[in-house]
Amino acid sequence: MEFFTYRLPNGIRGIHRQVKSNVAHCALVINAGSRDEHPDQYGLAHLTEHAFFKGTQRRRAWQVNCRLENLGGELNAYTTKEDTTLHATVLRGDFAKAVELLADVAFRSTFPERELEREREVIFDEINTYKDSPADRIYDDFEDLLFAGSALGHNILGTKAALARYRSEHIHAFVRRTHTTDQMVFSSIGNIAPRRIEAIAARYFADMPATVRSFCRTAPAPVAPFERNIARHTHQSHCIVGARAYGILDPKRLPLALLVNILGGPSANSMLNVTVREKHGLSYSIEGSYTPYGDAGIVAIDFSSDHDNCDRCLELVRGQIDSLRTRRLSTRRLALAKKQFVAQLAISMESNEGYMLGAGKSYLVHSEVDTMEEVYRKISDLQAGELLEVANEVLASPSLLVYR
């Protein structure tokens, strides 16, 4: 059995994979992120994630932070536009302690004002660091333009002015509205029997009252393609070419993921790396990405170059996109691309922690998780015509943002 799944009486779902390892990983994946903020709450989901570590009804902040660290383990969290994830890594024998701590911070955090004052300063520094990184900032600016007017069209970090307004009661209200038990998955991996996992999860999570989300997310409205140049006075030009794409439930997401990997994946033989970097020497770093959300997605190609080379890079990028839109991949080239993609996925799954987090997200969204064999079969079945189709549907009229 690849995965063991279960459901607690309060609606929290669980998924576990038993593997041979002395280390165990677990996570509470919550279907709540920055897109669930009201317009006057931007940055609140991320602040909430930080505030989870600042004290509970049972523990002070230092006790939360030291509970697993003293055991050689780790407690961490992250926020995306759609999810908040609390996760822990410990030795197998300390697994129950990790679960108890996750339950404590997820359901009994008090968000004390004195701790929030200090943590705001930490996030202010995070915002400053982000502003000093044009490669990070341009992606968020591009996404804001691409999803303008929607809940996906704002930065996760928020602004200093907004963060300065938030108090403990704002976080409590946000958690009550968005962190409902029907929107949670407890994911785990380690050398622990499935029924033992379910018993531990029930011990620490099942006494939490069942709650149900009372709102629905709104899909982003269409946005016309755009081209923007912004003066940032950076040492290099930074550029993104991209477009709206399929959401995570769309069956076309898999051929699109393969297409983006061929065009600008991490390998040295991706089309853009070969053309822009290796053949012409115009950019040190150029890559493509595909990020699917629940009801939409984004494909983006980003690079940096000397100011004088930016237009030539754009010309080459557009040429490679046009090639994928007008020429069907040969049988041999498609077979090699699929083999490469499968191998990359297999290597990435060697990380038990990454595998656990991915399984939790997949189970949250799809209520099932494909085995790696099923994923490999789906990739193997892809046809050149499918890639040609998605290239024309997604990349026919890409948008552009340039920092100069």
State where each predicted segment sits.
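N- or domain-start disorder-to-order transition segments that initiate the globular core
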Residues: 1-23
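Broad gene-expression machinery/nucleic-acid interaction feature
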Residues: 3, 23-25, 83-85, 183, ...
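Active/ligand-binding-proximal structured segments within catalytic/core domains
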Residues: 18-68, 251-264, 271-276
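Generic preference for hydrophobic
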Residues: 14-16, 28, 186, 241, ...
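Charge-rich, well-structured scaffold segments of protease-associated domains
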Residues: 64-213, 219, 229, 246-247, ...
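His/Glu-based metal-binding/catalytic segments typifying zinc-dependent metallopeptidases
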Residues: 18-20, 27-29, 212-269, 403
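Short, conserved beta-strand segments within well-ordered enzyme catalytic domains
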Residues: 15, 25-29, 52, 76-78, ...
